[in-house]
């Protein structure tokens, strides 16, 4: 089965802030921290392991299996426009999995259009299932499985599935904009 690997990093921002640091090897044994625990330790909703391992500034859960994501989005309550959306969260504090980036999964029902919205956050959309189109400003973009496209900041956008269902993962700089008190969101009718 084909695998797609997509790294979304906050490195451009961190680089502009001159705050990029890394520990170069060789390291025979990496120090254990909470993210070295097995992912199964973080699967039970509302329950966390007590551990003497040190914390990390990101989600200690390094893998969110797609089968679990699909089950969760199927059970998610629909929004007013019929779509469903879930946030990927850090199981320790309920915050984002990366402190500066927001990650969601969005499920669209066939032939239904999401409400138009615009935000000061910049967003990357990765189509995981289905096909459809997005109206982004004055431009219509058709998409299908494995397509990647962006939503520029402060541009009206909506999505429509043309298949029975479509699922996207979205990643944005919403978290850093929120922390800088610069996040603004408008939702159309």
Feature locations, PLM:
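A short beta-strand-loop-beta hairpin characteristic of the jelly-roll/cupin
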Residues: 1, 117-145, 182
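Conserved metal-binding segment of the jelly-roll/cupin
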Residues: 1, 5-10, 136, 142-163, ...
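A short hydrophobic beta-strand segment most commonly corresponding to one strand
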Residues: 1-23, 125, 164-184
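Short, flexible loop/turn elements at secondary-structure junctions
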Residues: 9-12, 107-112, 128, 155
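A short, N-terminal "cap"/entry segment at the start of jelly-roll beta-barrel domains
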Residues: 21-100, 104, 184-187
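Glycine-rich loops and low-complexity Gly/Arg-rich segments
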Residues: 29-34, 111-113, 128-133, 151-152, ...
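Active-site lining segments that contact anionic ligands and/or coordinate catalytic metals
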Residues: 83, 100-103, 121-124, 129-131, ...
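A short beta-loop-beta micro-motif enriched in histidine and acidic residues
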Residues: 93-102, 109-124
């Amino acid at each position: 089965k084909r695998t797609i690997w997509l790294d979304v990093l906050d490195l451009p921002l961190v680089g502009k802030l001159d705050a990029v640091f890394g520990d170069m090897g060789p390291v025979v044994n990496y120090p254990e921290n909470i993210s070295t625990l097995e992912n199964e330790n973080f699967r039970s909703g509302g329950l966390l392991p007590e551990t003497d391992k040190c914390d990390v500034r990101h989600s200690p859960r390094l893998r969110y299996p797609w089968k679990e994501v699909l089950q969760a989005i199927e059970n998610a309550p629909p929004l007013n426009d019929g779509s469903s959306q879930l946030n990927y969260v850090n199981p320790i504090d309920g915050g984002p999995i990366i402190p500066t980036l927001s990650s969601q999964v969005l499920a669209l029902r066939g032939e239904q259009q999401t409400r138009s919205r615009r935000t000061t956050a910049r967003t990357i959309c990765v189509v995981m299932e289905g096909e459809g189109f997005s109206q982004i400003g004055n431009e219509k973009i058709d998409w299908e499985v494995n397509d990647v496209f962006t939503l520029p900041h402060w541009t009206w956008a909506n999505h429509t599935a043309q298949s029975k269902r479509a699922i996207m993962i979205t990643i944005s700089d919403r978290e850093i904009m929120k922390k800088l008190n610069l996040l603004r969101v408008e939702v159309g009718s």
